[in-house]
């Protein structure tokens, strides 16, 4: 049996909270073993905090369960509890479920290839309000969409290279615009920072992760980059004309730098610290996924 104490991070922009960048083959800090017969099972409880450019604080407590079905097959279940606090109020609730299946395509004594297929399932419609005023996506606990996820990774003792696709399948039901907030007396300087997101169609995302690990005795250090490229612009309903429109500057690259540290106390217990910081951001994020930096703490029990 193996237990791990970890401090983990979600990328600063691009992935949803506990999003597809941490599903299956795309997860950071994946354990590598040259034991060809190993089957990994784990339960993780993690907590993180993220800071947005608008001084909102986003919290997520996530249950992450991984079950090795065979030596080549595994399933993962994730459920976050989300909370947001900022200039527009405080909200909290259960986030979206993530389900994935991972298959090891090839494993040798030196490397392995993994592939993941999965989905994000909404437990809400992203339509929460505060004092009868619709909240922007930064304050929603759910993305409000069913998402298809596909990913693949190459893993060695020193390197992790992964790529993936997240494909939203429907429009959410968010109704945020600045007008009702301004009518109720909220400063336009505050509320106009948030992009309107009425009936938002989120764009498709492609992820690429590269991570280098150095291990000396009980100490390990990792450094990496995580890029998310939005293939197409988000689409929403204009609050004035009521017509559909593309959101300018909502597509393109978001890049995050990652730095990690782990210390193995013994074969059963390891402490990990990872910090992520935004390097390149998209100028407009009506989906509420932008973070300037994110850091968290978690406990993993492996058996």
What do the predicted segments below correspond to?
Residues 10-52:
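Outer-membrane beta-barrel biogenesis signature
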Residues 91-197:
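Outer-membrane pore/translocation modules
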Residues 14, 27-35, 72, 106-113, ...:
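Short loop/turn motifs that connect adjacent beta-strands in outer-membrane beta-barrel proteins
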Residues 64-66, 102-104, 151-155, 162-164, ...:
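Transmembrane beta-barrel domains of outer membrane proteins
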Residues 35-62, 89, 137-141, 246-247:
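Surface-exposed strand-loop-strand hairpins of Gram-negative outer-membrane beta-barrel proteins
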Residues 48-52, 56-58, 82, 87-92, ...:
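Outer-membrane beta-barrel translocator domains and adjoining extracellular loop/strand segments
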């Amino acid at each position: 049996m193996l237990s791990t104490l970890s401090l983990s991070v979600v990328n600063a922009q691009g992935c949803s909270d506990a999003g597809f960048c941490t599903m299956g083959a795309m997860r950071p800090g994946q354990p590598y073993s040259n034991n060809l017969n190993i089957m990994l099972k784990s339960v993780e409880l993690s907590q993180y905090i993220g800071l947005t450019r608008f001084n909102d604080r986003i919290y997520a407590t996530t249950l992450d369960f991984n079950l090795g079905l065979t030596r080549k097959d595994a399933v993962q279940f994730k459920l976050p509890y989300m909370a947001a606090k900022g200039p527009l109020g405080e909200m909290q609730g259960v986030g979206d479920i993530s389900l994935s299946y991972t298959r090891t395509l090839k494993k040798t004594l030196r490397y392995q290839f993994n592939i993941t297929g999965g989905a994000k399932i909404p437990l809400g419609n992203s339509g929460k309000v505060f004092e009868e005023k619709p909240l922007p996506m930064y304050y929603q606990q759910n993305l409000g969409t069913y998402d298809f996820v596909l990913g693949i990774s190459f893993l060695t003792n020193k390197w992790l290279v992964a790529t993936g696709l997240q494909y939203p399948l429907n429009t959410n039901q968010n109704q945020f615009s600045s007008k009702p907030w301004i009518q109720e007396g909220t400063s336009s300087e505050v509320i106009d920072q948030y992009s309107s997101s009425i009936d938002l169609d989120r764009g498709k995302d492609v992820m690429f992760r590269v991570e280098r690990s150095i291990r000396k005795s009980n100490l390990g250090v990792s450094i990496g980059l995580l890029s998310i490229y939005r293939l197409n612009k988000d689409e929403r309903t204009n609050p004035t004309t009521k017509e559909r429109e593309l959101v300018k500057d909502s597509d393109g690259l978001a890049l995050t730098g990652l730095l990690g540290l782990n210390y193995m106390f013994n074969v059963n217990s390891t402490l990990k610290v990872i910090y992520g910081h935004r390097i390149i951001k998209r100028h407009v994020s009506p989906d509420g996924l932008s973070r300037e930096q994110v850091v968290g703490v978690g406990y993993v029990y492996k058996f």
